[in-house]
C-alpha cells in the first residue's frame, strides 16, 4: 500500500521509500523532511485533477508532495499488540 492509497484523514506508518525513476536523491530529500521508516504519516488533503497531496509527518511537520512521489512511499497500518 502506498501513501497515495490512503484516504484523507487516515494515519499510517511509513514502511519504506523507493527511489523509482527519481534516483536516490528523492529518498534523501524525503528523509531530510522526516519521511522515513516507522514514522507516522497522515493524509490531510488531496488536490483535485492530479494535484499534490498534503501530508503531516509525525505530529508537527506538514508538506505537500507530488502524487508521483507519494506513490513511492510504502505505508502500513500499525498493528495493536
Label each region the model flagged.
Residues 10-12, 49, 54-81:
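C-terminal structural segments of small proteins and small subunits
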Residues 18, 45-50:
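Short, charged beta-turn/beta-strand-edge "cap" motif at the junction between a beta-strand
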Residues 23-29:
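Short alpha-helix capping/helix-loop boundary micro-motifs
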Residues 2-3:
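Tandem CBS (Bateman) regulatory domains
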Amino acid at each position: 500500500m502506498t501513501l497515495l492509497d490512503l484516504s484523507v484523514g487516515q494515519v499510517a506508518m511509513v514502511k519504506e521509500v523507493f527511489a523509482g525513476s527519481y534516483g536516490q536523491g528523492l529518498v534523501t530529500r524525503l528523509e531530510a523532511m522526516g519521511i522515513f521508516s516507522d514514522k507516522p504519516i497522515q493524509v490531510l488533503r488531496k488536490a483535485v485533477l492530479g494535484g499534490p497531496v498534503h501530508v503531516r509527518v509525525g505530529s508537527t511537520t506538514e508538506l505537500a508532495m507530488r502524487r508521483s512521489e507519494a506513490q513511492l512511499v510504502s505505508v502500513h497500518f500499525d498493528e495493536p499488540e
